[in-house]
């Protein structure tokens, strides 16, 4: 109840950030509310509505709370501004969206799947009309024959664009678009590795996942350098891709009349085969076995990335693999999954959130201060945003993964409440005592207050509500 009530303040209308500016001009901004990423720092203007944040939060904030019309509007507005096969990172009321995120698209597709499965509209949504603001011919003439007419067509277009490969330079690249980024950071590239089914992307000069802190301190020497580029095949993107492929491959052809994509080599790859390749290769590529040669003493966990430019970053223990576990548990060996989750529980889970980096890593810096003007590169201007501070939203996915792989006791009944609730006692206290009646974006080390974080964050509330909702749904079935 407290979590559900906490979602209400994020959905509102504001003159500077309607969901879609063109529609606002026609209907008046009061009729076009949008979902704020966090309060008060992400309340207005182009910083209010983020694709990634929106679709991580949508299930908890809008679907579980039965606000299906709001969820539908949000999905269709973002659908209308897909470009290059990508969902925008910053929506900017659909005026000048920015397409510099590799993961926002996959959270968007997961949100479509969730909407179809949870809303009364169901699969009928797949035939809903979609009209792109920027037609396919403007950004990839090779795919002009796939100009979408429906949501189903749009999903196919996105998957086809990734299978073919995505390569473009951000529009208006330069200091006017991003005052911190270096020239190479504006180049956006994504590719499919046909043999394994993995999607790779990014480079060491940009940061296309949620761990997106770009350095800005000339004094400390981190300006233009991403703290966590995570280029390569990021584990949560692989999980979200698998979830999407499993879903579309299993749909009736009447709801999803597309069976295959064409890869960059010209080969036809069916969705069922793509799904199977991921299933076949995931454990081999991501599991760090006891006998593996690795630049870390840790074993029995899942890599954060495969194929990073800085190859040792593949082996960093971060809270991203539970996201993949929650949306695509079939990828994981149950025995390996339990070992990895136990390690994460020991090393990463804090009082309210999860450490964004293993505290035993040399790069770990657990306290975030955005106003740090020191000469220490590792923390100057908050460069350590995702190098230790404890973010709340990944915990929701961790709890769902934990319940899936540890959720049965020896008698076969649910152990979910017994295991999960102790992790949530401090959240309940926070909801009752916070002036915002909400949960924060993140905390500093060991759960200490971070004054530079939002005290109310949509995805923090949403993923924990989702975890509890899923737990109760499972127990109701039993």
Descriptions of predicted regions:
Residues 1-478:
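Acidic, mature catalytic/reactive cores of soluble proteins
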